[in-house]
């Protein structure tokens, strides 16, 4: 039986940092989550468990060190402890000795790993988080918007109130550990009796198991339902902002708390404005005469309002005109940024004879040498 390469499963090198391992895990766990792979749920569940197993080992420095050194964590690998086949008694002796060296002495110094390699199936666990993307328009950044959301999630089973136990059946003593929460194993070797003790994997160390699993949820304490909420997108939200809705995720297992809902905001739609922080920037083209004499322009803001702005005489090409307090509200304080108009002075490529004559007169008044046609 080939051993699993946890590094290969997560797609990282053997020298990967904890942050690289964590990022790889987050990416893969989203990709292979069973709730996102309805068409091939069986494969997704297998991949999901495999990824969880790999991360459980590589994210723990002690377990990772053991894995790097021995190639496994927990129970003795299938091919360990063999030798001297065909010599009857000697085979058993050396098998015991191999088991002792590979398992019992290892556990004496490093602790029994079997508990951590198996998830406790009956203890409360928080539910998974849910990620959803929503689109908002540039105009909605000014006022904020409430968006109705509808999605599937696991909720607490109303029949058993999330306990996973059929009402009236109660809890009974675990038959494997007899209520102690731990299992004791004794093995006789030529060195004597070796004792192993580990957390019971049937009751998860609680010493109790359901008398009868809930007939509605199958013992998980949760069932799948359609959930509807209204999410408040605050004014001033930026593209790529992630809003956390506490308790909006899946219900936990066996009475565990709800996970969270993460709303990923995308700002969509065309606009002639550019956003920089909470400031709005707009390129404004004006005639050269207006640049010289000054003028007033009307700007249609993203929220539909019309703002009249005075352009001073003598404004230069590329100059920025600030209109204070007309930008986007800050998402936290509500204070608005500024509107910034970048002036683009338009020079005509052709003028009428009358205009040309007047311009020459102006040029002479300014002491310029004017070429006569």
Curated annotation (Swiss-Prot):
Molecular-function GO terms, alphabetical: ATP binding; heat shock protein binding; unfolded protein binding; zinc ion binding
**Where would I find the J domain in this sequence?**
5-71
Q: List the disulfide bonds.
A: none
InterPro entries linked to this entry: DnaJ, DnaJ_C, DnaJ_domain, DnaJ_domain_CS, HSP40/DnaJ_pept-bd, HSP_DnaJ_Cys-rich_dom, HSP_DnaJ_Cys-rich_dom_sf, J_dom_sf
Q: Which residues does the annotation say bind Zn(2+) 1?
A: 157, 160, 214, 217
- What's the cofactor? Zn(2+)
CXXCXGXG motif repeat extents: 157-164, 174-181, 200-207, 214-221
Comment on protein domains: The J domain is necessary and sufficient to stimulate DnaK ATPase activity. Zinc center 1 plays an important role in the autonomous, DnaK-independent chaperone activity of DnaJ. Zinc center 2 is essential for interaction with DnaK and for DnaJ activity.
Q: Which PANTHER family match?
A: DNAJ HOMOLOG 1, MITOCHONDRIAL-RELATED (PTHR43096:SF52)
Against NCBIfam families, the record matches this protein to: DnaJ_bact, PRK10767.1, PRK14282.1
Name of the molecule in the record? Chaperone protein DnaJ
């Amino acid at each position: 039986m080939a051993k699993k390469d946890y590094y290969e499963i997560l797609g990282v090198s053997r020298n990967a940092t904890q942050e690289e391992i964590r990022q790889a895990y987050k990416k893969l766990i989203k990709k292979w989550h069973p709730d996102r792979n309805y068409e091939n749920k069986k494969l997704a569940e297998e991949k999901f468990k495999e990824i969880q197993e790999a991360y459980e080992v590589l994210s723990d420095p002690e377990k990772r060190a053991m894995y790097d050194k021995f190639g496994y964590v927990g129970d003795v690998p299938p091919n360990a402890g063999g030798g001297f086949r065909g010599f009857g008694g000697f085979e058993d002796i050396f098998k015991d000795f191999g088991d002792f060296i590979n398992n019992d002495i290892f556990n004496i110094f490093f602790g029994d790993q079997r508990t951590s390699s198996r998830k406790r199936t009956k203890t409360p666990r928080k539910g998974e988080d849910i990620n959803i993307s929503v689109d908002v328009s540039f105009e909605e950044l000014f006022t904020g918007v409430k968006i109705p959301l509808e999605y599937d999630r696991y909720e607490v089973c109303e029949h058993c109130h999330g306990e996973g136990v059929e009402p009236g059946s109660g809890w009974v003593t675990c038959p494997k550990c007899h209520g102690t929460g731990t299992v004791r194993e004794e093995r006789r070797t030529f060195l004597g009796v070796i004792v192993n003790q580990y957390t019971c994997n049937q009751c998860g160390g609680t010493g109790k198991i359901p008398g009868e699993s809930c007939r509605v949820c199958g013992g998980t304490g949760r069932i799948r339902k359609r959930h509807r909420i209204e999410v408040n997108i605050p004014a001033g939200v930026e593209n790529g902002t992630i809003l956390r809705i506490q308790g909006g995720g899946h219900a936990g297992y066996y009475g565990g708390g709800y996970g969270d809902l993460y709303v990923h905001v995308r700002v969509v739609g065309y606009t002639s404005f550019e956003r920089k922080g909470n400031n709005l920037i707009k390129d404004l083209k004006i005639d050269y005469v207006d640049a010289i004499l000054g003028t007033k322009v009307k700007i249609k803001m993203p929220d539909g309002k019309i703002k009249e702005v005075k352009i001073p005489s003598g404004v230069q090409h590329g100059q920025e005109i600030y209109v204070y307090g007309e930008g986007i509200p800050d998402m936290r304080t509500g204070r608005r940024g500024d509107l910034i108009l970048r002036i683009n002075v338009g020079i005509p490529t052709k003028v009428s004879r009358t205009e040309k004559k007047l311009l020459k007169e102006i040029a002479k008044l300014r002491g310029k040498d004017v070429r006569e046609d």
